[in-house]
Swiss-Prot record:
It comes from Fusobacterium nucleatum subsp. nucleatum (strain ATCC 25586 / DSM 15643 / BCRC 10681 / CIP 101130 / JCM 8532 / KCTC 2640 / LMG 13131 / VPI 4355). One of its GO terms (molecular function) is glutamate racemase activity. The active site is at C76, C186. InterPro entries: Asp/Glu/hydantoin_racemase, Asp/Glu_race, Asp/Glu_racemase_AS_1, Asp/Glu_racemase_AS_2, Glu_race. This is Glutamate racemase. It catalyses: L-glutamate = D-glutamate. Belongs to the aspartate/glutamate racemases family.
Amino acid sequence: MAEKTQRIGIFDSGLGGTTVLKELINSLPNEDYIYYGDNGNFPYGSGKTKNELQKLTERILDFFVKNNCKLVIVACNTASTAAIDYLREKFSLPIIGIIEAGVKIASKNTKNKNIAVISTKFTAESHGYKNKAKMLDSELNVKEIACIEFAQMIETGWDTFDNRKELLNKYLSEIPKNADTLVLGCTHYPLIREDIEKNIKIKVVDPAVEIVERTIQTLTSLNLLNDKKERGRIIFFVTGETYHFKPTAEKFLGKEIEIYRIPK
């Protein structure tokens, strides 16, 4: 049986999930977190099959179970598209997916039910958002746009790419004229939100905000909110390099991080 003092597990293919972690820390600072960055197997969004993604994420869930997690957040849109149902069948602990959160926050913000989603190739081609929208809000019209290079560019250093503005213009020009809301459908994208917002006039929404609400609701309903007074501990585990990951995560989160490298 789960206990209040157990940890919250968050995972992503790399740095992107830190955008979700930051929102969680702001709202639930007393919780203990384990962040699993599978950057040794990055990228998830191109070149991997659904089956491969299911196996990779199953291994991560095993890691969380062994490390005493009470709830898991799939802070990766690609993994959520490929594996959320598979993981929920395999594991009994609560698992929160980011695609559902993205559809929910878009539904709350759109005035005309026309939204666009920028995401990885896998998420777009698998129609992760369109399929989930049919289940959660059938009136939503969803335009999915695959920004093939973005996650890799952000993971390795967005500002080092001279063609970033050109690519931004290319992909953002695909947003339909009648769309009034843009969903950041990859957790890496909030890291370049400022650049995205400079190029468009419609509302930009980040599913991480909805993830926080769902996490609070789930933990409250299960009586698992950590009620200790001191700030929680955050431990990072990565399957790839730490020399770029560590300073980038620290700069974004505004604090030093405790990080360990584990086999991929």
